[in-house]
Amino acid sequence: MKLIIFTGLALLLIVSLIDVEAQNEGACLPRGSVCTTNHASCCSKLSCDCYRRFEKGVEKGQKCWRIPTGLRYSKEKE
């Protein structure tokens, strides 16, 4: 009887841990999604890259996106 109870509790613990891990993986932000400078919510191998937008010399805010770590974008010379 004790073996059945122990086995049931162990199985319940394993299922709970698998469910928590799956929920944590779904909480990260995927590539290309809007982000803040909080790097904790990035999926693996992604970082939050931000830039400031200007229109006619007036700042229009900051935009941040999830991109692969180490990738840099630059303005193309005209």
Curated annotation (Swiss-Prot):
Residues 1-22 form the signal peptide. Contains 4 disulfide bonds. GO terms for molecular function: toxin activity. Keywords: Disulfide bond, Secreted, Signal, Toxin. Expressed by the venom gland. It is found in: Secreted. This is U7-lycotoxin-Ls1f. Residues 23-26 form a propeptide. It comes from the Eukaryota. GO terms for cellular component: extracellular region. Belongs to the neurotoxin 19 (CSTX) family. 07 (U7-Lctx) subfamily. Its main location: secreted.
